[in-house]
Amino acid sequence: MAYYPSCSGATDQLTIPTIILIGELDDWTPAKDCERLMERRAGKGAPVKLVIYPGAHHAFNVAAFRDGMRSFGHWVKYDADAAQRSVLEVHDFLATELAKIEDRLKTNVASWQQT
């Protein structure tokens, strides 16, 4: 999982399932870069889910930035709604991906037991 990553230099050949969580108004690691990454990698590599939180800035899940502030020239600000929704998104993403792994393991174990 990647909270507000820098997608500008990211490879389009991701090898593991990934969820990207980013704020629409992030001026440090812009969501537009992640949207371009998704366009570049369409159909390549492991599945990637991009979630953009409307009105949210960089560090939207860091409660210490409740009032917002400038950090290294960028605006960081907590957004309780985006933070809560991101936890649910990560939970659902991990549950889905781990269920896929569990299914593959069950299939492998069953085939091993038949040999």
Residue map of PLM features:
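Secondary-structure boundary/capping motif
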Residues: 10, 29-30
